[in-house]
Structure formats: structure tokens, C-alpha cells
Amino acid sequence: LKVPDLPLPESYXXALNLAXD
């Protein structure tokens, strides 16, 4: 699972949500 290094946990989540899709 690859996610961008974002400073905000919310953005991370979002990234995880997109990756997951």
C-alpha cells in the first residue's frame, strides 16, 4: 500500500480511502 507523505492525518486517510478503492 502506497500513500503520499502528507502532514495531515486526515489527508492520509483520504489517501488510504482512495488506495483502497
Swiss-Prot record:
Q: Where in the cell is it found?
A: Secreted
Keyword list (alphabetical) reads: Neurotoxin, Secreted, Toxin
- Domain of life, per UniProt, equals Eukaryota
Where primarily located?
Answer: secreted
What species is given as this protein's source?
Scolopendra viridicornis nigra (Brazilian giant centipede)
GO cellular-component terms in the record?
extracellular region
Identification of the protein by name: Scolopendra 7997.01 Da toxin
Q: In which tissues is it expressed?
A: Expressed by the venom gland.
As for family, the record states: Belongs to the scolopendra toxin 8 family.
Give any GO molecular function from the UniProt entry: toxin activity
The answer to whether UniProt assigns keyword Cell inner membrane to this entry is no
Q: Does the keyword Membrane apply?
A: no
